[in-house]
Amino acid sequence: MAIKTVGIVGAGQMGSGIAHVCALAGYDVLLHDAAADRLEKGIATINGNMARQVSSGKLEDEQRSAAMSLIRPANSMEDLAGVDLAIEAATEDETVKRKIFTQLCPILNPQAILATNTSSISITRLASTTDRPERFIGIHFMNPVPLMKLVELVRGIATDEETFRKSKDFVTALGKSVTVAEDFPAFIVNRILLPMINEAIYTLYEGVGTVEAIDTAMRLGANHPMGPLQLADFIGLDTCLSIMQVLHDGLADSKYRPCPLLVKYVEAGWLGRKTGRGFYDYRGEQPVPTR
C-alpha cells in the first residue's frame, strides 16, 4: 500500500510544518489538534508561510493554492481513520504521546504506518504502547520543517523493513535528505546539539559571559547562523529541558545534567519565543537579552 494520505496529530510549530511540506509534495493531509484554536492557527500559519514563499519567489501562487487545497482540518481524531501514515507531532512529553497512541491505534487502518516526530524519546518504548510495533517508526523532522533539509529515521527494535522502506521513500518524496539513527536517547542531531546548548546556558549561569557575549562568540567565532541561547529560545526551553532530561536519565552521565538556570526558566514559564520571554525578551519591537 503506497502512502497517499497523511494524518498529523498536533498542529503546533512542528505539526503545521510537516503538513506544509506534505501538501507541497502532493500528499492529501488531515491535520488534527485537540484544541480547535490551535488547529485553526496551524492552518493559518501554513497559509502565511506559503504566502511568504510566493512573495520571495520560491513558490508560485498556483502551487500555494493547490497545496492548501490538499490540507483538511480534522476536528476529531476519528477523521484519521483512512490515512496511510499517521504522524504524531505533539509536545515532547512521553505521557502525552502514549495517550495519543492509545486513542489513535483503534481508529487507524491495521495496515497504516504510525510514526512519531519525537526528538529524543525511545522509539522502542513508544512502540510498545501501540498495536503495531512492527509498523511504528521515528520520523524526526528538523525545525523549521519547510526550511531544514534533514530528517532522522529511527527504527525501534520491532520496526519491519517494509515500514522503514516506505518511510524512507516518503521522506525522499518530500525533498528531504535522510539520515538513519539508532534508537539511543536523542538520536544524532540532538545528542550533539542539546549538550552544546546546555553548556552555553551553564556559561551564562556561571557568569562567564552575558547572553549577548555568548551568542556573538558562537556566531562569529564558530560561524553558527544563530547563537546557542537564541536557538534555545527558538526551539523552546521546555523542549530543551525535556531532551536533556531524556539524555541524563537514559545515559546516566552527569555531563547531561540540565543546567539549573534552564530548569528555573521553564519553571517560571519563560519558554522562549513562543511565550515572549526566554534568554531574550520578545515583547518589544526587537528581542532584548534578559541577562
Indicate residue ranges for each PLM-predicted region.
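Rossmann-fold dinucleotide-binding core
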Residues: 113-182, 187-191
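Amphipathic alpha-helical segments at domain termini/boundaries
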Residues: 24, 31, 65-85, 166, ...
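NAD(P)-dependent Rossmann-like dehydrogenase/reductase catalytic/cofactor-binding core
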Residues: 27, 161-165, 172-183, 202-206, ...
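Structural motif
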Residues: 9, 32, 74, 89, ...
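NAD(P)+-binding Rossmann beta1-loop-alpha1 motif at the extreme N-terminus of oxidoreductases
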Residues: 1-52, 56
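Rossmann-like NAD(P)-binding element
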Residues: 38, 52-113, 121
